[in-house]
Amino acid sequence: STDAVGDAYKMIQRDMAKIIVAGGVEQISIDLYLIFYLRGLLSGLDGTKEASLPFDRARNGFVLAEGSYVVILEELQYALDRGAHIYAEIKGFGSTFVGGKKHPENVRVHRVEKAMHDALAGAGLKKEDVGLISANANGCKMQDKVEAKAIQSIFGTGSSQIPVSAIKSNVG
């Protein structure tokens, strides 16, 4: 879903459209559930209460749920010319998602680093300009570790001073 927003952003940058509706939906199928269950990635499998607790010591996986979202993206000047209220502006985007592939930790860290680097470069920002990191943070120990390592690698010693949010734990 986020890749759909990134693709829409790039299409608007390339002047392929002025307005794009982008988003996504996730519907749980038994196959999807079984994949996550068999890999031990679901919260609550150890008898504890299901909870999404990204970066928490008590985390034990994610809560599988259905959801959807849609956003409307517009070329900025087009939106301003028509008097639209601007809620946010996408300044850069980076994604290195490869679904269905299981990579070693160092490869995963590198891919997350590249996504953050691409987003910063696309926005013309330096790491010192960042005031908040919105992590994927799905509550799985392995993925949280990968993201934490990538954040440390990109932002260095200053990473401990930048708040890290985890919206996925609240909205999926």
PLM features: residue spans?
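Short glycine/threonine-rich loop-to-helix capping motif typified by GTGT followed
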Residues: 100-109, 138-155
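Beta-strand segments within the central parallel beta-sheet cores of soluble alpha/beta enzyme folds
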Residues: 17-26, 85-93, 128-135, 161-168
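Condensing-enzyme catalytic core mediating Claisen C-C bond formation in acyl metabolism
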Residues: 47-125, 131-132
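Active-site-proximal alpha-helical scaffold in enzymes
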Residues: 1-26, 63-84, 172
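Conserved catalytic cysteine-centered active-site region
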Residues: 1-7, 16, 38-63, 149-172
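Fold-level recognition of mixed alpha/beta catalytic cores in primary-metabolism enzymes, strongest
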Residues: 24-27, 35-40
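Conserved small-residue
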Residues: 1, 8, 36, 72, ...
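Short acidic, glycine/serine/threonine-rich loops at helix termini
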Residues: 5-6, 30-36, 100-103, 144-146
